[in-house]
């Protein structure tokens, strides 16, 4: 894992098309802004995991529909 230190207002680049900017720090919360092309999905981890679970459940349902 790459660990970087950034201050409020500073940005890091992910590849050529994605920027992540530190917008603010309040207590133990950090607000970040992400600029990415439309074709790049950006989700909080818990939302991403929920999407993956739903996809798996749907795939399981479609497997059973063929029976």
From Swiss-Prot:
It holds the Pfam family CsrA. GO terms for cellular component: cytosol. One of its GO terms (biological process) is positive regulation of translational initiation. GO terms for molecular function: mRNA 5'-UTR binding. It is found in: Cytoplasm. InterPro entries: CsrA, CsrA_sf. Keywords: Activator, Cytoplasm, Repressor, RNA-binding, Translation regulation. Homodimer; the beta-strands of each monomer intercalate to form a hydrophobic core, while the alpha-helices form wings that extend away from the core. A key translational regulator that binds mRNA to regulate translation initiation and/or mRNA stability. Mediates global changes in gene expression, shifting from rapid growth to stress survival by linking envelope stress, the stringent response and the catabolite repression systems. Usually binds in the 5'-UTR; binding at or near the Shine-Dalgarno sequence prevents ribosome-binding, repressing translation, binding elsewhere in the 5'-UTR can activate translation and/or stabilize the mRNA. Its function is antagonized by small RNA(s). Belongs to the CsrA/RsmA family. This is Translational regulator CsrA. It comes from Hahella chejuensis (strain KCTC 2396). The gene is csrA.
């Amino acid at each position: 894992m790459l660990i970087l230190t950034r201050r409020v207002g500073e940005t890091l680049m992910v590849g050529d098309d994605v920027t992540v900017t530190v917008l603010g720090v309040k207590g133990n919360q950090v607000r970040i802004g992400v600029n990415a092309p439309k074709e790049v999905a950006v989700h909080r981890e818990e939302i991403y995991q929920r999407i993956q679970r739903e996809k798996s459940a749907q795939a399981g349902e479609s497997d059973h529909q063929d029976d």
